[in-house]
UniProtKB/Swiss-Prot annotation:
Gene3D superfamilies in the record: 2.70.98.90
Transmembrane annotation, as ranges: 5-25, 371-391, 436-456, 486-506, 522-542
InterPro entries the UniProt entry points to: Membr_insert_YidC, Membr_insert_YidC_N, YidC/ALB3/OXA1/COX18, YidC/Oxa/ALB_C, YidC_ALB_C, YidC_periplasmic_sf
Family: Belongs to the OXA1/ALB3/YidC family. Type 1 subfamily.
Protein name: Membrane protein insertase YidC
Keywords noted in UniProt: Cell inner membrane, Cell membrane, Chaperone, Membrane, Protein transport, Transmembrane, Transmembrane helix, Transport
An individual GO BP term: protein transport
Length: 586
């Protein structure tokens, strides 16, 4: 990584920081004001979380609370377990909810299986208000499982349907059906409401996911930073991030939504609608415990229409719960892959989706070690950008050769800026040099370099994959934990950033420069220091990529310096030009 690349990285980083500040979602209003505006905009909307709190506090008779559905508020809970090739899920007859979801191939930081469902009462239920003022959360009702089997084991393309049902004597019926496949993290979720058209207020019901995803990483604060709720509607995503403690964040836009989801750093739970929806509901809060660790709790819902003139309403959904792996979430066919953060939509994301990930997957099919894959990838990118590096080096060498003339002119016309600019432009023109030629090739490859940053920062493929001294390429390769924290640097010492700083230092010594000796000396130490600080808290896989990119840059720069020579730049000496003699008249 040459000096121009580093300068470009710094400049674009500053631009990105400014962009994020300008384009960041507006901070939600305080709860009371937000609720007032929401009620004015959607008078019939159901405030799900408030109802949950209210219901949990009530000690009322089930009939008073749920009306004629109160008879199902008392019962005996039974559990049904489904084991597939990828996970083990547990369903409960209380609420027909999903109680646990334990992946087989992905463990927590202790290398133990963990339950992605954080809500102790389970998740996935229906919400609706009745015309007599009752608010029904089916998660509190006991369903009848339409199977006597308690354990299922399926694999491959085999599927199993598990229906739950409650029905009243007057013909009202709620049926919830799960459809699991043996080889997919995505499963079907179907609802059937019969006789509720004139029973439900607002002609609307909601399918709800309750709770954030369980923490699985050692650095819970970092995991919380990368956790949020998001919806895809109107061709774009809407994100809700509970970024501050003791604040409640809410969004409930109207419109046809393809999906609404909750994610952590490496996992996601998404509700995907197979038909038109009325909008989404998202709510989140950030909580801390006594140890100052953070957990972000979310609730999301899809809103669906329930016409009063229809006796039966059937709705189909799918639920994806599992790793945030690009190919897997893209396979849902719902554009759920949009929830993976690849940076700017029209700048870095295309590089990530159509270049970096396909090449990474190709290498993954032929190489077992992710560390080796990263090294090969760095070599590939260096070879691809070689023409740009060559063009940049040639331009910088020409600029370096012009420095004596430029300094002389600057001294000669230091009191005449206009004349100085004109003379410098003339020299550039005569020498055939573009002053931006040294940095323009670097700027062109900046989107690719930043796309690499986003991909390696969020790639689950690197999670818990070791290489050399690093036990996990998705976290810093710390070799020493400090008893204190250094501002910007952190509370640990990582090896790869130190090696990167050394590589950047030597790479700069090989790179042609147009700067003065004092400037060169300053930059020689500034950029290695910046790399040391910046990458100390980054995933070691990302650091390994940039380290090897710099090592290959050193080799490439050495080769260029040995095989190319600077063509002498010959300028006309105007002071020695003689006037042509006048032609004699005959």
């Amino acid at each position: 990584m040459d000096r121009n690349t580093l300068i470009g990285l710094v400049l674009i980083a500053l631009i990105m920081m400014a962009w994020f500040q300008l384009m960041a979602p507006k901070k939600p209003l305080p709860e009371e004001k937000a609720q007032q505006e929401r009620l004015e905009a959607v008078a019939e909307s159901i405030d799900i979380k408030n109802q949950l709190v209210q219901d949990s506090l009530q000690k009322a008779n089930p009939t008073q609370k749920f009306g004629e559905l109160g008879q199902f508020a008392v019962g005996e809970e039974k559990k049904i377990q489904i084991e597939t090739d990828l996970f083990t899920a547990t369903l409960s007859t209380k609420g027909a909810t999903l109680r646990s979801f334990i992946q087989k191939d992905y463990l927590n930081y202790k290398h133990e299986p963990f339950n992605l469902i954080s809500n102790e009462d389970g998740t996935l239920s229906l919400f609706f208000a009745t015309r007599d003022g009752k608010v029904v959360n089916t998660g509190e009702l006991y369903f009848d499982p339409k199977t006597d089997q308690k354990n299922f084991r399926i694999s491959g393309d085999n599927k199993v349907r598990i229906p739950f049902e409650i029905s009243t004597e007057d013909g009202r019926r709620i049926e919830i059906t799960y459809i699991f496949s043996g080889n997919s993290y995505e499963f079907g979720y179907e609802t059937n409401l019969a006789g509720f058209g004139k029973f439900v207020s607002g002609n609307e019901y909601q399918v709800v996911w309750t709770g954030g995803l369980s923490n699985a990483e050692k650095n819970v604060n970092d995991e919380a930073t990368n956790s949020y709720a998001e919806a895809y509607l109107g061709g774009s995503t809407l994100r809700l991030d509970a970024s501050h403690v003791d604040e409640t964040y809410k969004e409930q836009p109207s419109g046809n939504a393809k999906w609404v989801a909750v994610r952590s750093k490496y996992f996601v739970a998404g509700l995907i609608s197979k038909e038109e929806t009325e909008g989404v509901f998202m709510e989140g809060s950030r909580n801390t415990n006594d140890e100052k660790s953070v957990f972000e709790d979310y609730m999301v819902a899809l809103k669906l229409k329930l016409p009063s003139d229809q006796t039966t309403v059937n709705s189909r959904f799918s639920v994806y719960i599992g790793p945030l792996k690009y190919d897997l979430v893209k396979a849902t066919g719902s554009e759920l892959e949009k929830i993976i953060d690849f940076g700017w939509e029209w700048v870095t994301r295309p590089f990530a989706e159509y270049l970096i990930i396909p090449i990474f997957n190709f290498l993954n099919n032929h190489v077992d070690s992710y560390g080796v894959i990263i090294i090969l990838f760095a070599l590939f990118i260096k070879l691809v950008t070689y023409p740009l590096t060559m063009a940049s080096t040639k331009s910088m060498k020409k600029m370096a050769a012009l420095q004596p003339q430029l300094k002389a002119i600057q001294e000669q016309y230091k009191d005449n800026p206009e004349k100085l600019q004109a003379e410098i432009s003339g020299i550039y023109r005569e020498a055939g040099v573009n002053p931006l030629g040294g940095c323009l090739p670097t700027v062109i490859q900046m989107p690719l370099l930043f796309a690499m940053f986003y991909v390696f920062r969020s790639s689950i493929q690197l999670r818990q994959e070791g290489f050399l001294w690093s036990n996990d390429l998705s976290v810093p390769d710390s070799i020493l934990d400090l008893p204190f924290s250094i501002p910007l640097y952190g509370d640990h010492v990582s090896v790869i950033p130190i090696l990167m700083g050394v590589a950047v230092f030597f790479q700069q010594k090989l790179t042609p420069s147009t700067q003065t000796n004092d400037q060169m000396k300053f930059m020689m130490y500034l950029f290695p220091g910046m790399m040391l600080i910046f990458f100390n808290n980054m995933p070691s896989g990302l650091g390994l990529y940039y380290l090897m990119f710099n090592v290959f840059s050193i080799a490439q720069q050495f080769y260029i310096n040995q095989t190319t020579e600077t063509e002498p730049v010959v300028l006309k000496d105007k002071s020695k030009q003689k006037a042509k003699p006048a032609r004699k008249k005959k």
